[in-house]
């Protein structure tokens, strides 16, 4: 591709590239009309129509199974529709392969990145179009083109190192670079921030805005509403394989209306708050100090309560959860369970005492992705079945797994399915089931619905209410204001490693929580 094409990517949002893609006169750059895709017994897309303009970021939202992924596969040539048309820049297209879609100018940045770990950055950037002389790769030209692309993306990466040594955020930039090297006019992002840090997310948004300024059409698939409001110009909602609505402006779009479109019910039904009477104090932290806390922390949580913890990034909430769980050692203070002082040398001690953590990073810390649903569910309970730890009781493990698959309505073929094949919401249910099998009293839930669609969230909230109604305690750490207000009985706000205040449900508003959470 030309240097001119990529100029705007590393510049200011207002720059425009010389080769910017343009919509045909009077029409969108990309148009889908009546697209239908069916699989045996399933209509994945039902007469879907959608248009995307040059120079816009068009958000796609919907629950898992709504049809978003199938739509991306149609765009990329993986799935061929049984009906409908796809028009690109005024010309009807039908892609028989991903190569055909790429050559036409459509690139997909999938959640699971399609890079070759053992190849270098430069080789991945130019995959399929390596420069050569007399049948031999021209290494000098390859390095020069790769370095030029990286500089324009604002990435200071050695083009000669293998991709396996890069962070997730850096790898994602390489995927974007691949699309630009092919001069893609339509670029679709599939849940791109699910594994990114806050800094990497900011960098990604800068790149996407620059791509929009060049006149490219951006499709942005996400579960995160705050990203839609921050980044997208328009948003289309899918449900059950159908396009429900397209909102031509997100500036004044009511959040409750957007959720209602996605799930087919009101926001009150999503959170479904169920008030209940609280019992005796079940867990109490007294002057707890340790890594990530700037001041000693004290709080109580009662049986039957859902206590929310809200705060900005770096407030110390996750660090506090690790101290409670025995994953970090306190430097002062202690924890009491049922009025008795406890000291956990490890998470195993905490679990045996009746306290468990569902960690923020579910994929890295909460599950074993290559193991089955049953194995993940039985990781902790296994000690009850095999006290000698010599022989595993496969029958009891299968029975337990099936019981909780049915009880929590975990959507999986069976217990032998790899947990990595499940949606985020169903993975989280497996983690919860693991602790339900252990007869846990205190559930520490650290960002439990991150990356999970709205429908699955409602199911998880109902589980929280059931736990509280059974006399257990749920401590909910969440950065989602609507969630922490909608689900919690009361909310503790942290900032800069300390507790900044507590807000009763009756007085919990976004303004009240943000005011407490903001640094001085």
From Swiss-Prot:
Which SUPFAM superfamilies does the annotation name?
P-loop containing nucleoside triphosphate hydrolases
Q: Which Pfam families match?
A: ABC_tran
For molecular function, the Gene Ontology terms on record are: ABC-type L-arabinose transporter activity; ATP binding; ATP hydrolysis activity
> Where in the chain are disulfide-linked cysteines found?
none
Topological relation to the membrane, as annotated: Peripheral membrane protein
Q: How does it assemble?
A: The complex is composed of two ATP-binding proteins (AraG), two transmembrane proteins (AraH) and a solute-binding protein (AraF).
* Name the UniProt record assigns to this protein: Arabinose import ATP-binding protein AraG
